[in-house]
């Protein structure tokens, strides 16, 4: 294993930071160019293994920011165990394990997940077909109510309604039996109000379609 190096100059600079606030660029460059002081890896391991962890009390400064910076530059701490000089190299990456509950969910799932790694889109296709049927039904109902021609103004780049024609014969579909003898709708006092309201709603619908 290669020697474990600690930048002692960086630690000293952090300690002196609270005492001297102003530094010139040449001083900083000189300190950053100093060589690393290497120590024996076995001695370093022995020292750190004799301590539960490296804490703030190991710093000689009362400045919390400097304490944390010294701890960060000195060693990576592990609160649950002793710190070794080669702890970083010995650390293995954690491999996520498949939980039995996840496997059971995949086996019992009815949402289209298959065991072969593929995806079954049967349920999704049926839902899509139902949605398409609903859209088609809505369009057919709209066509019964409105017949609007929408043009595009190439100069402005916006929709420009050219021709709008309302099928007025569809307005009285609720009163289609009003000519039959004994129909109560024939003499309804709200008949005209309903017609006006229905016509107004259709005009609003035409405006909405033209703006889309």
Curated annotation (Swiss-Prot):
Q: Which UniProt keywords apply?
A: Glycoprotein, Host cytoplasm, Magnesium, Metal-binding, Nucleotide-binding, RNA-binding
- Name one cellular component (GO) term: host cell cytoplasm
Residues binding Mg(2+): 86
Posttranslational modification: O-glycosylated.
Tell me the Gene Ontology biological-process terms attached to this UniProt entry: viral genome replication
Q: One Pfam match, by short name?
A: Rota_NS26
Give a yes or no for keyword Aminoacyl-tRNA synthetase in this entry. Answer: no
**Where located?**
Host cytoplasm
InterPro entries in alphabetical order: Rotavirus_A/C_NSP5 (IPR002512)
Q: Name one GO molecular function term.
A: ATP hydrolysis activity
Domain of life from the UniProt record: Viruses
Q: Which cofactor does it need?
A: Mg(2+)
Q: What does this protein do?
A: Plays an essential role in the viral genome replication. Participates, together with NSP2, in the formation of viral factories (viroplasms) which are large inclusions in the host cytoplasm where replication intermediates are assembled and viral RNA replication takes place. Orchestrates the recruitment of viroplasmic proteins such as capsid proteins to these factories.
Q: How does it assemble?
A: Homodimer. Interacts with VP1. Interacts with VP2. Interacts with NSP2 and NSP6.
Similarity section: Belongs to the rotavirus NSP5 family.
Q: What is this protein called?
A: Non-structural protein 5
Organism of origin? Rotavirus C (isolate RVC/Human/United Kingdom/Bristol/1989)
Phylogenetic lineage:
Viruses, Riboviria, Orthornavirae, Duplornaviricota, Resentoviricetes
């Amino acid at each position: 294993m290669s020697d474990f190096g600690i930048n002692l100059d960086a630690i000293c600079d952090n300690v002196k930071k609270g005492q001297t606030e102003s530094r010139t660029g040449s001083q900083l460059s000189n300190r950053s160019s100093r060589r690393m002081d290497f120590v024996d890896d076995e001695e370093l391991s022995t020292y750190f293994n004799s301590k539960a962890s490296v804490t703030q009390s190991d710093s000689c400064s009362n400045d919390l920011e400097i304490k944390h910076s010294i701890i960060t530059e000195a060693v990576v701490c592990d609160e649950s165990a002793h710190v070794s000089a080669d702890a970083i190299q010995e650390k293995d990456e954690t491999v996520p394990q498949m939980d039995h509950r996840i496997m059971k969910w995949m086996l019992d799932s009815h949402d289209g997940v298959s065991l072969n790694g593929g995806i079954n889109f049967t349920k999704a296709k049926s839902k899509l077909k139902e949605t398409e049927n609903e859209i088609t039904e809505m369009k057919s109902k709209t066509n019964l109510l409105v017949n609007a021609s929408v043009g595009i103004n190439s100069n402005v780049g916006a929709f420009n309604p050219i021709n709008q024609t309302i099928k007025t014969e569809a307005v009285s579909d609720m009163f289609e039996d009003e000519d039959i003898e004994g129909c109560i709708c024939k003499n309804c006092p709200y008949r005209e109000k309903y017609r006006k309201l229905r016509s107004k709603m259709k005009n609003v619908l035409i405006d909405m379609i033209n703006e889309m």
